[in-house]
Amino acid sequence: MSIQSGEILETVKMVADQNFDVRTITIGIDLHDCISTDIDVLNQNIYNKITTVGKDLVATAKYLSAKYGVPIVNQRISVTPIAQIAAATHADSYVSVAQTLDKAAKAIGVSFIGGFSALVQKGMSPSDEVLIRSIPEAMKTTDIVCSSINIGSTRAGINMDAVRLAGETIKRTAEITLEGFGCAKIVVFCNAVEDNPFMAGAFHGSGEADAVINVGVSGPGVVKAALENSDATTLTEVAEVVKKTAFKITRVGELIGREASKMLNIPFGILDLSLAPTPAVGDSVARILEEMGLSVCGTHGTTAALALLNDAVKKGGMMASSAVGGLSGAFIPVSEDEGMIAAAEAGVLTLDKLEAMTAVCSVGLDMIAVPGDTPAHTISGIIADEAAIGMINSKTTAVRIIPVTGKTVGDSVEFGGLLGYAPVMPVKEGSCEVFVNRGGRIPAPVQSMKN
C-alpha cells in the first residue's frame, strides 16, 4: 500500500483536531479445540488459548499507535459463541465460563471480551437456554465480558420464544446490577454478523479461521469537519464529501490492521467502517446530520439524512479497502453520542424516531435507558419490532436497552467512559404481553427465498 505525503498530513490533522481514532483492534479466537465434557477442563483450555493467542495484542497496539501517531483506543477479544463450546459439559450454568473469559481478558490487558453468546434464530438447544439464563449472573460477576443473542434472521424468521426469554434476561440483569449497568454489555441481534469487532455484540463466527484480526475505525468528527470546511450546497455534493472522507478514514484503519496482522502473525480479517461516536464534543454522528441542515437530530428529515450518511460511508470505505466487513455504517448509540443525548433531552429524539432511523443504518436501538419499571414483555416487544426491521430488510439490527432501576422519565443515568450518560426515555403504555407470550416463530419473509 503506497501512502502519499498529503495523506499523512491529513491524517495528522484528523487525529489532532477532529477526534479521529482506531476504535479497536479485535482478535477473534476459535474455541472449538477447547471443548471438554468437564467444565473445569473447558475453563482451563479457554484460559490457556486466549492468553496464548492474545498475549501480544496490547503491546502491538501501543507500538503501532506510537509509530503512526494514531490513537488505538481499545484492544478486544471475541470468541466462538460459548453456547456451542460449553454444550458438551451438560452444566446447568455457564457463569464459571464467563468468569474464565473475564480472567483471561484481564490477564492480557484487553478492554473487553465478547462471545458469551447464543445463536437461536431458529430454535434453542438446551445449551443455548442454559447460556441465556446464565447471562444476568454472568454480567453481575464479571467486569469486561460482553454477551449477545441472535434471535432472528432473514432466512430463519424471528424466534419469539427466544425474544421473550431475552426480554426477561435483560430485565433480570437490570435488577441485579447497579443502575442496570450489566445491560450495557448485552446485545440482542437479528442477522448478527460473524466478524464484528465492536462490543458488546462481537463474537467469532464458526466459519472464521482459528484466529483473525478485525479492526474498527471511528471518525464522526472528521466527517463533520469535512462538511464544515466544504463548499457543498446540494445533498449530492454532501454525499461526495462524506464518501471521500470515509475513504481517508478507511485507509488509516487498513494500514493499522495489516501492520497488526503482520506483527502478530494472525490473518487480517475485516475492517469495519462504522462511524462510532463518543460522548466527547466533536465526536458525534448527530452533529453530522445537523451539519447537513437539520436544526436538531430527530426532527423530520433525520432518517433521510442518516440514510445518505450511511450509504456514502460505505461507498467511500469500499473503495479504500478490499476487506470491508462487520457492521460498517453509522452507529446511533444514545448515551455515547453528545448530540443524541442533547436531542433526547430536548424531547425531539424519541424511541420511535430511533427505531425509524435503524431501518437505514448500523445497527439498532443502542444504549437507550428506559424506566426501571418497564416490564419484561415491553422489552421483548421492542426487540421484536427491531428484529422485524432487520428481517424484512436483510440487514443487521440490534437492541441494547437499559432499564434503570429506581429511575423514571426525566431522570438520567451516568455510565462513564465511552458509554457516556443517557436521559431515561419513555416507552409506550399499551401492553404487548399477550402477543409476546404467544411464542412460536414469526416465519421468514418471502425475500428469504433467494435460491
From Swiss-Prot:
InterPro entries according to UniProt:
UPF0210
Q: What pairs make up the disulfide bonds?
A: none
Give one Pfam hit by family name.
DUF711
CDD domains per UniProt: RNR_PFL_like_DUF711 (cd08025)
Top-level taxon of origin: Bacteria
Q: Which family does it belong to?
A: Belongs to the UPF0210 family.
Self-association or partners: how does it assemble?
Answer: Homodimer.
Q: What is this protein called?
A: UPF0210 protein NMA1908
Organism of origin is Neisseria meningitidis serogroup A / serotype 4A (strain DSM 15465 / Z2491)
